[in-house]
Design a protein with these regions (language model features):
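Flexible "stalk/tail and boundary" regions
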Residues: 1-21, 25, 35-92, 96, ...
Length: 154
């Protein structure tokens, strides 16, 4: 992980990498050790796109909350996005083993069951938690798109 931006800009944490774990019998997932320092003060877990879960630092959550709050409430899509983001969100804290608890509603959304393989990825300012089955499909689609971009670039 590193801090992005120039010395004069506000620094933002950037999470990088891909890690495999298993959801334990109590619905907990190990957060990679290189990400834990940033989550010591707690974090927020919420629904992400493509059936992943997002883990945000408290600061990044506040930034995202402000963006969501500024969306026009007169637009149906904005209201739906806000509802999905906020109603599915939970405050969380790492336990002494570096794990976070994932409640049943978020496990169902992300298609992650007890004892399932899980992929935890750094995705810039957020950490994403994926069912490894879903992650492999997403990565396969991304690899194909990347190959097409390379063909276009020549």
């Amino acid at each position: 992980m590193f801090k992005s931006g120039s010395r004069h800009e506000r620094r933002r944490k950037v999470f990088l990498g891909e890690f495999r774990h298993i959801m334990d019998s109590k619905g907990r997932i190990v957060i990679p050790s290189k990400f834990r320092k940033e989550l010591q003060q707690g974090c927020v877990v919420t629904k992400g796109l493509d059936n992943c879960l997002q883990v945000l630092t408290k600061k990044n959550w506040l930034d995202e909350s402000e963006k969501m709050a500024s969306l026009p409430s007169t637009e149906k899509t904005s209201r739906q996005l806000r509802r999905a983001l906020f109603s599915g969100a939970i405050d969380s804290k790492l336990d002494s083993a570096g794990r976070i608890q994932i409640p049943e509603n978020l496990r169902k959304y992300s298609e992650i069951g007890i004892n399932d393989d899980v992929t935890v990825t750094g995705s810039g300012p957020v950490i994403e938690i994926w069912s490894t089955k879903v992650w492999k499909k997403i990565q396969n689609d991304a690899d194909k798109a990347f190959a097409n971009i390379n063909e276009v670039k020549g």
